[in-house]
Amino acid sequence: MSTGLQLLGTTLGTLGWLGIIISCAIPLWRVTAFIGNNIVTAQTMWEGLWMSCVVQSTGQMQCKVYDSMLALAQDLQASRAILVISAIVGLIAMFASFAGGKCTNCLADNSAKALVATTGGVAFIIAGILGLVPPSWTANTIIRDFYNPLVAEAQKREFGAAIFICWGAAVLLVIGGGLLCSSYPKGRTSSRGRYTPASQNGRERSEYV
């Protein structure tokens, strides 16, 4: 297994996991869309998965945690659950990739290390795929509402920074997991496949003749 490839995959996966945590925490999934008469508004709305914030033109910001989960939009409810699962799977992947690292002493057997590291890579990929769902779903909802004439201009939103952070984090998770999986040694010859005892028996028989 290539140590450099494994370290690169673990590093990218860890950065992706941190990106998932950041995007899940910051209240920047949806921001006020400045269109029409809204361009002179004195405040900006930020909406996240756990809270919403109002930023005044003076720079003062007030945030409030959502009182009821059922009052949230469907995409935000699902994004909460999916990103939490993605973060948990990513954490498991990090532990597995560290334990299976060639530069660590958690496992003595190299074959076991390779298997554990590859398992971590698969977990990183799963976490990345899960991480792609919430920003894509939210982005689709924002675009649909933005071009919906029945939605008031004051209620229309644009993409927040958290959506782009989550997309980037998910890509890093998938790439990191792919590197860990590709670093698994292929075509190894097991010592059990050697026929040394048979050749020794053949030499012994020739001596008796």
From Swiss-Prot:
Biased composition (Polar residues): 188-201
InterPro entries: Claudin, Claudin_CS, PMP22/EMP/MP20/Claudin
GO molecular function: identical protein binding; structural molecule activity
Cellular-component GO terms for this entry: bicellular tight junction; plasma membrane
Disordered: annotated span: 187-209
TM regions (residue ranges): 8-28, 81-101, 114-134, 159-179
Keywords, alphabetical: Cell junction, Cell membrane, Membrane, Tight junction, Transmembrane, Transmembrane helix
Bilayer topology annotation: Multi-pass membrane protein
Disulfide bonds: none
GO biological process, any: cell adhesion
Database matches in PROSITE patterns: CLAUDIN
Localization terms from the record: Cell membrane; Cell junction, Tight junction
Family of this protein: Belongs to the claudin family.
Role according to the record: Component of tight junction (TJ) strands.
Name assigned to this protein: Claudin-like protein ZF-A9
Classification lineage: Eukaryota, Metazoa, Chordata, Craniata, Vertebrata
